[in-house]
Amino acid sequence: MSAYFDALETRSDAQRELALSQALPAQIRLAQQHSAAMGRILKDIDANGVTSRTELARLPVTRKSELLDLQKAGRPADSFGGFAAVVRGPKMPRIFASPGPIYEPDVAARDYWRVGRAMHAAGFRAGELVHNAFSYHMTPGAFMMESGAHAVGCSVFPAGTGQTEQQLAAIADLQPQAYSGTPSFLRILLEKAQEAGVAISSIKKGLVSGEACPPSLREWFTAQGVDVYQCYATADLGLIAYETSAREGLVVDEGVVVEIVRPGTGDPVPDGEVGELVVTTLSPHYPLIRFGTGDLSAVLAGTCPTGRSNQRIKGWMGRADQTTKIKGMFVHPGQVADIVRRFPEVLRARLVVTGEMANDQMTLKVEAQQPPEGLIERIGEAVRDVTKLRGTIEVLTPGSLPNDGKVIEDARSYK
């Protein structure tokens, strides 16, 4: 039995980049021709010229908030705001809703969300039974996991959420080998089983998502005899990255291209620096190009010890949307980026807001190697020009600012 889901996982860098150079122009062209919204966004782009990650990074970023606005504007004529390249009917068996609401299409394709790869890495194998405890109501999480389980040859018990006693009875009767759902609900099941004296020790492995699973909780699961793995997936994009037995970050899925950009911009940051996760899908059905997730992450250096050769990320590290109201004016990360672009000598910057309610103090902290004379004054003028607010400028040596992805830090007292 193969240790890998397919041969794509162990490609050389050269093989992967060659495949990407062929896939990107085709995907851009498909998006332009079959997705009305992406066609408008990419109308001035020559698809044939987008053959690498470098060229991809020059395309505009579409953020989730924009997707929601376009969907609202297009309803009821177009539920998906012009982003889907598939229409209602046999090819779209379901439509799901996520908070917003944002509507997402289901597609009649094997393992549409590509979760099978994460299932395989978590040790799920053909012939096993998966206890699927994601909600089957309105949102796609349960169907994402179920389609992935089917892709690796598993059967699924559609448990959903709640009704803990009935779920424990079903586990005791059916003896599933695996669990999929949130980590918090798995803990509830295990604790309730202990209290009730119900044997559910058949569950030896789990694939969890939807919320954080810190090391302390993973250790607790291990002590209960359950080997838990995490995956990072969204309703819009499907599987983005997944955990392996190496337990070193998350390996990026083969069906997406991942970039880490400075929040509020489309500019890639150096490997290891925290920024916003931007994803391009290679799906012909829902072709999202440079989709800003609003989540923070960072590239993890090196390759996975398991032999999976794709890029790795550190996982979910918070939210990138740091828009803050200062003295009645909204200031967003893109404005800070605009200020930084005016000064080549500035390496990184962070806007820190302090003070108490109605007495906001704004300080722009910038890193510069050898700040020239007059830099503070010129940056101060740029701050006033861009934000229409006055603030203090503080110049720091390179490496002084924390590597946590924050561009705007709200340190005000709200007592």
What are these language model-derived features?
Residues 1-6, 58-224, 237, 247-248, ...:
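Active-site phosphate/ATP/adenylate-binding loop shared across adenylate-forming ligases
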Residues 1-97, 101-121, 125-126, 358-363, ...:
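Nucleotide 5′-phosphate-binding alpha/beta core
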Residues 31, 98, 130, 179, ...:
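Residue-level signal for inorganic ion chemistry
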Residues 229-234, 353, 394-395:
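Beta-strand->loop->alpha-helix junctions that form or flank phosphate-binding loops
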Residues 213-304:
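Conserved AMP-binding/adenylate-forming
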Residues 176-185, 228, 249-257, 411-415:
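A polyampholytic, Gly/Pro-enriched intrinsically disordered region
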Residues 179, 282-389, 405:
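AMP-binding/adenylate-forming catalytic core of the ANL superfamily
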